[in-house]
Amino acid sequence: MRSFSIKSFGCRTNQAEAFQWAGRFQSHGILLKEDSYQSDIVIINSCTITQRADADVRNFVRKISRRNPKARIIVTGCFAERDPLLFMKDPKVWKVFLNNEKDDLQKEVIESYGKNEPVKYRPFRSRAPVKIQDGCDFKCTFCIIPQVRGQSRSERHEKITGRVRALVRKGYKEIVLTGIHLCLYGRDLEPASSLPELLSELVTIKDLKYIRLSSLDPRFLDKEFIDFIASNEKICPHFHFSLQHTSGRIIEKMGRKITSEKYREVLEYTREKSPDASMGADIIVGFPGESGKDFDHLYAFLEKSPLTYFHVFSYSPRPGTAAAGLKGVDSKTEKKRSALLRELSRRKNLEFRKRFENAVLDGVVIKEKHENLHVLTPNYLKVVVPGSGCRRSSLVRVRITSVK
């Protein structure tokens, strides 16, 4: 029996695509293996958001070729879209598919390796990522995504709800809505729709316990939307915002058309309406022209904000973007600033988690390891409890006895 594995780099949208492919391949009799060094086909869904992402993809191709030389390697995703010839010329790579050829990728694998009889379904993830949107209509000066993903495109309501109902029947209790720019959802549909309209349908699905949103752009969040999310028990109290920076000068250089005052308003109103929510943000350090004063503004803003964690990224020039030719901050300064923000994030997150010591919370089993259950709560607390025998995606109730 032929087998496949999928390695996704980068965003949750890539993860959602891989999740969907895994289900389809299994329904056509191809066995899922988690170990890429043991599978017949290795599909790489690549990322090109940073130079480091590019390097990670190329290193993985080399590792697979060295440790699993008989595997057929397929490369797709954003790095393949940006530089397809790089992989087409690589003798280690069997085939390359651009982002708009991912349906062809699935067809190729099924026609080459599929059977009429499905294999027993093996969950690819403990929570089901569901892609509802792709692409972006904006051109932030640092971002290559619009070039490799195209303009915003939304899935229709009926297709999404049908997919979610099928996942619930398979036993999934939580879905994670993903997209390149979730807040643009529905604007391109006819008639036009919106993310709140879609959520209003999804929350009515029986036996669906949790809906988690991946990343939200504060530029498109109003009080009505925040009120809706905060007031619905099925929508997880977990907000992840694409902030990037808070200094007005740097925000303008990034082409993001928002102010730090608007950021503050959104964050504080979200905290007011959802006091127990986990609130995170993406932050870019070292953007060209970032002065000490700009960084001090960023640090002070984050320190005073209700955010409970942040993902810190070093600025990485991307070919074809408006900022690519600008001189960035020197490496030593950038590393120092990044370290300061990561330490601040660690302290803020510990402070947030300590609030829930001795609390009893529900959650979803992510995995079982060494006779312990790893559980994720709706507000993004990762809890380890003694126990075994619970399959992934099960609902459990836990008491948090200590915080580390």
Task: Indicate where each model-derived feature is located.
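Canonical Radical SAM [4Fe-4S] cluster-binding loop centered on the CxxxCxxC motif
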Residues: R125-E158
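Cofactor-cradling patches in redox/metallo enzymes
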Residues: M1-E108
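N-terminal [4Fe-4S]-dependent radical SAM core
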Residues: F97-V130
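Terminal RNA-binding accessory module
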Residues: G325-K404
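Conserved alpha-helical substructure of the radical SAM core
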Residues: R149-V176
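Glycine/threonine-rich flexible loop motifs
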Residues: R52-F60, R153, R249-G255
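Conserved SAM/AdoMet-binding glycine-rich loop
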Residues: I73-I74, R82-D83, R169-G292
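Radical SAM enzyme [4Fe-4S]-AdoMet core and its adjacent flexible, acidic
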Residues: C11, Y185-V203, D207, Y315-R347
